[in-house]
Amino acid sequence: MALKCGIVGLPNVGKSTLFNCLSSAKAQAANFPFCTIEPNVGVITVPDERLTRLAELVHPGRIVPATCEIVDIAGLVKGASKGEGLGNKFLGNIRETDAIIHVLRCFEDENITHVDGTIDPIRDKEIIDTELQLKDLETIESQLAKVQKTAAAGNKDAKVLAGVLMAYKEVLEQGKNARVVTFDSKEEQDAARNLFLLTSKPVLYVCNVSEAEAKDGNEFTKKIEAMAADEGAEAMVIAAKTEEDIAELESYEDKQLFLEEFGLEESGVNRLIKKAYALLNLQTFITAGEMEVKAWTYKKGWKAPQCAGVIHTDFEKGFIRAEVIKYDDYIQYGSEAAVREAGKMGIEGKDYVVQDGDIMHFRFNV
């Protein structure tokens, strides 16, 4: 299950700098691989110190982290929803992503011009929001035209869909994003999910600040954080220029020293990837053996058979049981055999809800 995030933002906000830093993040993840699929698409590893700790005990042939696909989505201008600039391509690329990383300029620099002449991240956010909302309204109105007659004739599914469409239409016409709407019934939730609205996607607002403000942010970032909370989104502070400097350093030790100088415990890039992962309610279970220590991505709340299916569909179909070791127990006892001997290995059935960091071994029969 690969996570796909799209990075968006107006020109000169630091979007491409941030993407380039993400492209260089291989050096911060113990030389895990980074590859470029297209010039604007990269696959990057999800930082997870647990894999390194386990590898020190297991001595596997390789370490395989979870991955995240990052797409640098072409900049847009006002009128993108009507196809101006790179509008149609921009909006099409966003539709294919699971989550949006929205970079906002929260720094002053007279050498870097702003497309609108002044620094105002709230205004910048609203420009992109408006384009996405207009495109969503277009989708809603097109669907409504098709479904209203069927709903009026008494079709139950059409009635549910029409109700969902009208709820979205109301908030979008108020200049709000679709993600603020919630539905109670499973039928409504399914209908909403199948619309693939742009403004219903989870969003992480990334406040790009100066190096001096990397730790505590500024007045701009406080406004963005408050606004994000109001719409059920996430926000974080990052200094793309600082991240660019970190990316140029060769060793892990040099990077850590650099971070300490700025009073930072972890690079902004690492924090960003982890936040994006959490944004989609994704978690990690681990398999550990002589061949490899590997992270597997699953949705929070999934049960053991569903997680087995992440490895192979046959594992889910023929699921018998799962042998589960808690990460802390593995670290404490030092090996699978020692965990067994201490009676700390759990034998779980099909109703077991997998927890983040569980070390799993699945028994199945095909």
Ranges and model annotations:
Residues 1-113, 141-143, 147:
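Conserved G1/Walker A P-loop phosphate-binding module
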Residues 30-31, 112-116, 217-219, 249:
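Short amphipathic alpha-helical segments
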